[in-house]
């Protein structure tokens, strides 16, 4: 289980975002979490969770329906939200270290409906001028697609159930929880089909 050969030198890292809408250019990024999937005894395993609550950027759109869906109140001071640039540093710097620690050249984003998470991450990186983004700019692994193939279901909660993994609906729609659970799903799929 060598990430330099198993994934062509890319460290798989699950990213999950919670947002205030579907438009990565105009809607606020509210939470960001990343979980490297690392080799260990018996296969691949979720690593440490790196997370940050994010302050909406100036002029960001906040769709009421999205806020209701996630249950996030962007104005809640108890969230401990950071400006986007600081949140990116908080989450992505440990990922850069993990990439180096595993002798990889970059991270490859893993996500459930990965294009959504990738688009919001890239928009925040571009908006803030964040330097040294550890992720490949466009390649990713999508666990919705992988779970559809492996377990016959693309909905995260149902895929987790079919994979025999724990899922708590009460904790869902938290970037940290969803990222950690998606990392467990990805690791299970990789361990099942690791060659």
Q: Across the structure, where does each feature detected by a protein language model lie?
A:
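Active-site-proximal helix-loop-helix substrate-binding element of RNase H-like nuclease domains
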Residues: 54-70, 74-77, 143-180
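Conserved protein kinase catalytic core
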Residues: 22-24, 148, 184
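Residue-level recognition of the N-termini of beta-strands and the immediately preceding loop/turn
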Residues: 105-108, 135-139
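Substrate-recognition/cap helix-loop segment adjacent to the acidic, metal-dependent catalytic center
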Residues: 118-138
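Generic detector of well-ordered alpha-helical packing
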Residues: 17-19, 32, 118, 143, ...
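Conserved non-catalytic scaffold segment of RNase H-like nuclease domains
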Residues: 1-112, 163
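Acidic, Mg2+-coordinating catalytic module of metal-dependent nucleases/exonucleases
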Residues: 108-115, 119-120, 124-125, 157-195
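Glycine-rich, phosphate-binding/catalytic loops in enzymes
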Residues: 29-33, 126-129, 179
């Amino acid at each position: 289980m060598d990430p330099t050969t198993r994934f062509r030198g890319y460290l798989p890292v699950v990213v999950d975002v919670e947002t205030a809408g579907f438009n990565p250019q105009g809607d606020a990024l509210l939470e960001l979490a990343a979980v490297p999937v690392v080799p260990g005894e018996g296969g691949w395993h979720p690593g440490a969770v790196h997370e940050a609550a994010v302050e909406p950027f100036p002029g960001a759109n906040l769709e009421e329906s999205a806020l209701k869906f996630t249950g996030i109140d962007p104005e809640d001071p108890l969230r401990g939200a950071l400006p986007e640039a600081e949140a990116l540093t908080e989450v992505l710097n440990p990922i850069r270290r993990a990439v180096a620690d595993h002798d990889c050249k970059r991270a490859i984003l893993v996500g459930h409906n990965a294009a959504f998470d990738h688009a919001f991450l890239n928009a925040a990186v571009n908006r803030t001028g964040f330097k040294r983004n550890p992720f490949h700019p466009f390649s990713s692994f999508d666990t919705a697609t992988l779970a559809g193939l492996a377990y016959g279901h693309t909905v995260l909660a149902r895929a987790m159930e079919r994979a025999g993994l724990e899922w708590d609906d009460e904790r869902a729609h938290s970037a940290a929880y969803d990222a950690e659970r998606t990392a467990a799903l990805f690791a299970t799929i990789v361990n099942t089909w690791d060659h």
